[in-house]
């Protein structure tokens, strides 16, 4: 389900290795790369959704990672109309996301892109922390900027510097309405078709 403003509740995952490089996944059968992300199901907390998506998309279990931080508020992006499925136009606007910063405590070979029946990625690599800002699709860039900047202060000291900070970038950011209003997390509802596929 969507919230009252037409945004789908979602989680995003920034997964670090011991060199503070980030996991970057290639969407299956495309040339598009992105961070792991996915919808929050009815009754799930953002943390529960994060662990589920981490296993479905990357094949990792909770014991393979350590949570370093999460964004305080929802970060939102609107999806351009031509990427929205026709039947969802008029009520679906985009995604609102809580982002998690995780550190891999296991090994690279603990990852398995085919841990579920419908894999999201068919390849992956480690990237320097700020590189995704240069290559992510335009309408997600502001949210990536805000998430990476907010989470950067929780990086282990070895890589604690904000290269490539940009001025004038904006993303939709709101207080956590569901927490403040006492509402339960909402059912995830696909409405978006991006170059990476439905998310």
From Swiss-Prot:
Pfam families: NUDIX. Its EC number is 3.6.1.-. One of its GO terms (molecular function) is pyrophosphatase activity. Keywords: Hydrolase. Gene3D superfamilies: Nucleoside Triphosphate Pyrophosphohydrolase (3.90.79.10). A motif (Nudix box) lies at residues 38-59. Residues 6-149 form the Nudix hydrolase domain. Its cofactor is a divalent metal cation. InterPro entries: Nudix_hydrolase, NUDIX_hydrolase-like_dom_sf, NUDIX_hydrolase_CS, NUDIX_hydrolase_dom, RppH. Residues 166-199 are annotated as: Disordered. Accelerates the degradation of transcripts by removing pyrophosphate from the 5'-end of triphosphorylated RNA, leading to a more labile monophosphorylated state that can stimulate subsequent ribonuclease cleavage. HAMAP family: Nudix_RppH. Belongs to the Nudix hydrolase family. RppH subfamily. This is RNA pyrophosphohydrolase. It comes from Methylibium petroleiphilum (strain ATCC BAA-1232 / LMG 22953 / PM1). The gene is rppH.
């Amino acid at each position: 389900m969507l919230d009252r403003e037409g945004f789908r509740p979602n989680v995003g995952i920034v997964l670090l290795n011991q060199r503070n490089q980030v996991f970057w996944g290639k969407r299956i059968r495309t040339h598009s790369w992105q961070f792991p992300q996915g919808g929050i199901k009815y009754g799930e907390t953002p943390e529960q959704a994060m662990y589920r998506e981490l296993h479905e998309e990357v094949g990792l279990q909770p014991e393979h990672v350590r949570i370093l931080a999460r964004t305080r508020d929802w970060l939102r992006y609107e999806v351009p109309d031509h990427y929205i499925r026709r039947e969802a136009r008029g009520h679906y606007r985009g995604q609102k996301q809580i982002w998690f910063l995780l550190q891999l405590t296991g090994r690279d070979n603990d990852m398995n892109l085919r841990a579920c029946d419908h894999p999201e990625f068919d390849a992956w690599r480690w990237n320097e922390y700020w590189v995704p800002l240069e290559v992510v699709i335009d309408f997600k860039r502001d949210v990536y900027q805000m998430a990476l900047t907010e989470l950067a202060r929780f990086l282990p000291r070895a890589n604690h510097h904000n290269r490539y900070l940009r001025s004038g970038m904006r993303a939709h950011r709101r207080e956590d309405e569901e927490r403040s209003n006492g509402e339960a997390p909402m059912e995830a509802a696909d409405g978006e078709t991006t170059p990476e596929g439905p998310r």
